[in-house]
UniProtKB/Swiss-Prot annotation:
Residues 772-869 are annotated as: C-terminal. CDD domains: AAA, RecA-like_ClpB_Hsp104-like. This is Chaperone protein ClpB. It comes from Staphylococcus aureus (strain N315). Keywords: ATP-binding, Chaperone, Coiled coil, Cytoplasm, Nucleotide-binding, Repeat, Stress response. GO terms for biological process: cellular response to heat; protein refolding. Residues 85-145 are annotated as: Repeat 2. ATP 1 binds at residues 205-212. Residues 340-549 are annotated as: Linker. Residues 559-771 are annotated as: NBD2.
Amino acid sequence: MDINKMTYAVQSALQQAVELSQQHKLQNIEIEAILSAALNESESLYKSILERANIEVDQLNKAYEDKLNTYASVEGDNIQYGQYISQQANQLITKAESYMKEYEDEYISMEHILRSAMDIDQTTKHYINNKVEVIKEIIKKVRGGNHVTSQNPEVNYEALAKYGRDLVEEVRQGKMDPVIGRDEEIRNTIRILSRKTKNNPVLIGEPGVGKTAIVEGLAQRIVKKDVPESLLDKTVFELDLSALVAGAKYRGEFEERLKAVLKEVKESDGRIILFIDEIHMLVGAGKTDGAMDAGNMLKPMLARGELHCIGATTLNEYREYIEKDSALERRFQKVAVSEPDVEDTISILRGLKERYEVYHGVRIQDRALVAAAELSDRYITDRFLPDKAIDLVDQACATIRTEMGSNPTELDQVNRRVMQLEIEESALKNESDNASKQRLQELQEELANEKEKQAALQSRVESEKEKIANLQEKRAQLDESRQALEDAQTNNNLEKAAELQYGTIPQLEKELRELEDNFQDEQGEDTDRMIREVVTDEEIGDIVSQWTGIPVSKLVETEREKLLHLSDILHKRVVGQDKAVDLVSDAVVRARAGIKDPNRPIGSFLFLGPTGVGKTELAKSLAASLFDSEKHMIRIDMSEYMEKHAVSRLIGAPPGYIGHDEGGQLTEAVRRNPYSVILLDEVEKAHTDVFNVLLQILDEGRLTDSKGRSVDFKNTIIIMTSNIGSQVLLENVKETGEITESTEKAVMTNLNAYFKPEILNRMDDIVLFKPLSIDDMSMIVDKILTQLNIRLLEQRISIEVSDDAKAWLGQEAYEPQYGARPLKRFVQRQIETPLARMMIKEGFPEGTTIKVNLNSDNNLTFNVEKIHE
């Protein structure tokens, strides 16, 4: 017995047989140990052949185990188990060797062991019974005329079935979604496939535009016989490159597998069209020192026209991998696959609608499909149609499906209330005092009412679930009948096709309509139902909001109120700048109502005015009121961009420079939060060339970063602040606080000297902030003191400041050229510092109120007024 004349699978089975003998404490390797090991080998050919012959493999394996247990085990010291081979096992190998010679093979393979076992082993004979000829035929089919010339022959057996999937067969079985549209690309692919040489199309397009769908569409046309005569007998196999590479342990095994696949394709005489998705992976696949990569193995067959191949890859990967190998590139014909427009996407979604309804057991409204196409096109800018629209519909269906599977909120609340009352009831039953008895009686009455309510709701939910289940079942039956009709028409079974088309399908459609009408009549409007089974445009809007953070769903009442009173909310934080507040809040309202220009940002403003008048504060308060947090504001301090080259920090370093992979500060922030407030603070400090980047943001609502990706700014509010012209404003403002026309012109003159006209012309509005008046200061004092009280609240302390003291604080800190900041510092010195010293020195108890007054010497006095008990 020469182990080197056996395949790796047989060698592995013998090794496993030795281990089995050791487990059973047997000195000899019995025939059952070898056969059991062969059966349990990973990817066992022995097992695969028996399964295809419909033999109970598990029972056969158990029979081998039972037979092994009948052999006498040997106990003792220094006994070597599994060192010798039994007479019957030796006969098995000898007989297998004779089969090897009969098949003209070079190595003993698993099929030889199986043939030998069928002749020698009684257990195997018993289970195979009268299926000997069937197994011989299966072995012949599996081998496919190949000879065992290597120690890993299984690689060559049925290579296409192992490393690919038959798309035409999947279409026949109804496993594939229908392909709608893409007729021109499919026709182009068919034309290229019909050529004599270089008949290999490669589909090139962005991810998600439907490259794979075109090949699936071709497979569907082949099944429907809607192709030229030359393609009628063809089948399309999708090659699974990952399966081809996975588990290739030995050097050259990958090449061996690929050669086996190509050999099968070649021997089919052009009947098999090989589809390789992500074809760029072939370039370099399996490449090791001195080895040939997969791309080079394909070239000769492609050139001779022996291999019909369809490839699919993206533009970037085609350029990076295939264009570099010009010899491979010239063997393919390019078919450009462009992104479909919104109308085509809606048609595609309508075609897929029924399949998704049947799969999820829901009903999809047409307006949900329209919303999915339109909203995904508008808001999800980093992906492509129709993929992103299909994903939206699928996600919305899954959301409704999960809701249908769980209890409605109303019933859930009642269930929890009943459980709570039952626990309370069991506790009160153990009490004997009158108060507890009284409470128990009240509780039992409430529990009875809640249980009655629970039963009514449960009954309603069960009724709705039953009706929905009936609808789902009827839709599934209709889908199966339509699939059966297609099969009957394809197979020219006219009698069955007529029965389905004019009998079964109309009847099922009628029954489905009746069920839907009854459900509609009984349950009323969708809003009255306990369980929702309809996907509407609202669900689509909610999912777009989840994915992007952009609010596109319908306005709820609370948000409606917030938007209508947005200017009032902003006025509470920003004092004295009515025009600026109104302009910003109006822009937000326009955007949320859906009537803003879809190709520009929500708003772009330049705030001009002296320091400390509320320019930055307005941007912060807008972010806080829109997103409930100032953290959603993207703040960029333009004083950091004083050099011309600093613009690369906004959009990312160019290729070849350090930090190219990190992206830009502005572009990356907006990609993560497309709905945000962008504050470009102190713009006059930046280099003027930096603003050239803003041109396309302000006009087109997008910016291309250093990697060539387009970043969408259409859902941002851009606010720039500057102190340009602040001196003119301070000197020429009226006593009433109004800004005169001449002052405005003087400020604009200063502005034109700094900014280029094309930037100023693209802004929605240039807002002049007026210097703060003495009246404004008193309001700001109130605001600062409110914030101080919020901080003190954590220590259960409060502060009350008299009106005289507030007026004195505003008067003393009033410096028009510096705005509100001196007031903040003045309050820190006059109130916060003395208060902090008192707190550290005296340690106020919780509930203390400190009263601050102004004495006759114009000094502030601090009195501990009262302590709350």
